């Protein structure tokens, strides 16, 4: 596996048509080179959470970004059955006063993917993008509960998988087993969410 990340900000002016096009082209060229070498490209077009935009704006912009990415991937004759898409979930901006429920996050995210991603794509691995561990887990869980597509929906988290373990380790540097237990718990919670089997009460067990 290899990964290339294209980053997009949301504001009054961004993402511009030029940035959407240039990032899509770069992701497609990367994917072509990777598949020529017999590897699997992870294609990551990330629309950032930073800003005061609404979830509806995020939905519109993310759909534009993903659609353009796949247009470029097809121009470059990428085997879509041999890639993994790593998108953001549909969320309101971090400074927005228009936060939405996890149910809406799931429904908006699925709407975006169903309208933007070709059916040949086998798997979607979400980035956490600055969500808390619980938010990223709960949102992934509901996406899988409501998933009425053939896409496999899983996670490719950074902070939302590692934060608790790093915090524990920073205060207990010698306690390797304890750090591993904290990390394993978070990984187990995310794995259950990827199956639509997570619930909040499992966090305390």
Residue map of PLM features:
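Active-site capping/gating regions of soluble enzymes
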Residues: 53-205
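Helix-rich catalytic cores of soluble enzyme domains
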Residues: 1-73
């Amino acid at each position: 596996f290899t990964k290339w990340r294209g980053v997009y900000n949301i504001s009054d002016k961004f993402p511009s048509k030029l940035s959407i096009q240039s990032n899509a082209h770069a992701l497609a060229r990367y994917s072509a080179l990777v598949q020529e070498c017999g590897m699997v490209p992870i294609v990551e077009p990330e629309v950032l959470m930073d800003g005061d935009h609404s979830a509806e704006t995020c939905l519109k912009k993310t759909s534009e970004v993903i659609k353009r990415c796949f247009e470029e991937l097809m121009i470059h004759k990428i085997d879509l059955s041999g890639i993994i898409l790593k998108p953001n979930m549909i969320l309101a901006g971090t400074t927005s006063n228009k936060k939405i429920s996890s149910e809406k996050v799931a429904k908006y995210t699925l709407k975006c993917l169903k309208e933007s991603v070709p059916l040949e794509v086998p798997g979607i691995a979400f980035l956490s993008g600055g969500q808390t561990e619980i938010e990223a887990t709960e949102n992934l869980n509901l996406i899988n509960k409501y998933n009425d597509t053939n896409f496999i929906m899983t996670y490719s988290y950074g902070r939302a998988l590692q934060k608790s373990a790093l915090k524990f380790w920073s205060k207990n540097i010698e306690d390797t087993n304890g750090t591993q237990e904290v990390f394993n718990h978070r990984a187990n919670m995310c794995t259950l969410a990827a199956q639509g089997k997570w619930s909040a009460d499992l966090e305390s067990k």
